[in-house]
């Protein structure tokens, strides 16, 4: 998880062996992935951020084409393509041209092609960027299902992507790891840093904004409730310590505009 420009795509390309690290190593079962070479790539599935497919191909024909590139025999490729098209919810439109697909449907074709070789590791670079809320929810549910049997490495700047599917999160900024852990571990680290403050008017909002970072503003009939974060304890009379959310963590480390895509 990280804002645009944090280095997520670079990292995904390195894990997929498409880009060599300038220093350090990436290990799989204790061995450098670049020395494992084809033995490593044979167990990896990859969906790049800018995935596209031949638009005149049908979804099934495209998967059969990718299967041929992977060296699969026709019968195996056909059986696998049908199975995956059912998994991603595209079996009923398998013979439809990809040019007629929505962005979310194309991403699901991308997931299917990445799963053709039964990968042990599935690498997904910003897979939900640009999708509408319904397609994004469908995509997250699909990832939860796939993740039962496959290691899924997902990069995103969208908080809701990882809140519902990730077992562990690495937050990066400017190519550096800021923190790493389970959701509970990361949220526990934010305890005592998130507060609710109720004010009466806009001038009080501005006063709070000058002192603390505001995560959200909820305007009610009689008052305005501010959700704020602070590294130090807030002793204002109207401040109430509340349980942290992942949005608070993101706001604590990154800018507001990166956290508002939901």
Predicted region positions:
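Helix-to-loop junction immediately C-terminal to a conserved catalytic motif
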Residues: 16
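Conserved ABC transporter NBD signature motif
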Residues: 24-35, 39-40
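Conserved ABC ATPase "signature" region
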Residues: 64, 68, 75-93
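Conserved ABC ATPase signature
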Residues: 97-101
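A short, proline-enriched helix->beta-strand linker immediately N-terminal to the Walker B motif
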Residues: 116-120
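Catalytic Walker B motif of ABC-type/P-loop ATPase nucleotide-binding domains
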Residues: 122-126
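ABC transporter nucleotide-binding domain
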Residues: 138-227
């Amino acid at each position: 998880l990280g804002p645009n420009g944090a280095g997520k795509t670079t990292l995904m390309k390195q894990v997929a062996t498409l880009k060599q690290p300038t220093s350090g190593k990436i290990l799989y079962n204790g061995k450098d992935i670049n020395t494992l070479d084809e033995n490593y790539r044979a167990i990896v599935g990859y969906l790049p951020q800018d995935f596209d497919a031949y638009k005149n191909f049908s979804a099934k024909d495209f998967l059969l084409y990718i299967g041929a590139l992977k060296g699969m025999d026709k019968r195996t490729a056909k059986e696998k393509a049908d199975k995956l098209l059912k998994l991603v919810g595209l079996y009923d439109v398998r013979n439809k041209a990809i040019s007629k697909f929505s962005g979310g449907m194309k991403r699901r074709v991308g997931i299917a092609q990445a799963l053709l070789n039964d990968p042990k590791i599935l690498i997904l670079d910003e897979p939900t960027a640009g999708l509408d809320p319904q397609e994004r929810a469908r995509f997250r549910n699909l990832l939860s299902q796939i993740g039962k049997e496959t290691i899924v490495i997902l990069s995103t700047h969208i908080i809701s992507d990882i809140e519902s599917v990730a077992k562990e999160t690495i937050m990066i900024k400017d190519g550096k790891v800021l923190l790493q852990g389970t959701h509970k571990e990361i949220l526990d680290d934010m305890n005592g840093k998130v507060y609710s403050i109720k004010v009466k008017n806009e001038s009080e909002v501005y006063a709070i904004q000058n002192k603390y970072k505001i995560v959200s503003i909820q305007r009610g009939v009689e008052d305005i409730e501010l959700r704020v974060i602070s590294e130090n304890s807030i002793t204002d009379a109207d401040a109430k310590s509340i349980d942290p959310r992942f949005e608070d963590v993101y706001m604590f480390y990154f800018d507001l505009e990166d956290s508002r895509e939901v």
